Swiss-Prot record:
Upper classification of the organism: Archaea, Methanobacteriati, Methanobacteriota, Stenosarchaea group, Methanomicrobia
Species per Swiss-Prot/TrEMBL record: Methanoculleus marisnigri (strain ATCC 35101 / DSM 1498 / JR1)
Family under the similarity heading: Belongs to the archaeal adenylate kinase family.
Signal peptide residues on this chain, from the entry's feature table: none
Name of the protein in its database record: Adenylate kinase
Compartment(s) of residence: Cytoplasm
The keyword Ribonucleoprotein is assigned to this record: no
Amino acid sequence: MLGKKVVVTGVPGVGKTTVINGAMERLATEGVAYKAVNFGTFMFEVAKKENLASDRDEMRKLEKDVQKRLQQAAATGIAAMSGEANIIIDTHSTVKTPTGFLAGLPEWVLRELMPDIVVLVETDPDQILMRRLGDASRARDMEGYRAIAEHQEFNRAVSAAYAMYTGCTIKIVRNENFLLEQGIDDLVSVLR
């Protein structure tokens, strides 16, 4: 039997990786194994093997056709992993670029991955803004409340399109301030 393929997404600063890590720890104590894979890191590893990039930032400068091929290679590799295990794919539904929103899972990626579930980790935009302001370790674009709310709304719309294409379900998990355990509980219930 193939493992579950669960895509977990969220805007920068929502705490997506924190919720994923907490859920994986909890599931491990129950004997439910998942492997977490960061889609961008997987792409970079392929690019590095092919001597196309020495760091992740260089990937953005590659020709569009090369980037598409790297995305396809990453999607194929990650999909193959699900034959052996349950997989959490840590990625973004959309990426905000200077020219607009870019789909994080274009058609050629979805065709390979065919996720069972897409999870959107969300919280109130003001909480995300405060987290971003308090995180000196990351170089994130500064956005206001309205821009963060718009990004989360767009993620929902794009995720609905992903569901229409793949037949997957969509789950929204809230990661509210001081309620991390509740967010972890919600993700665990989806992953069981």
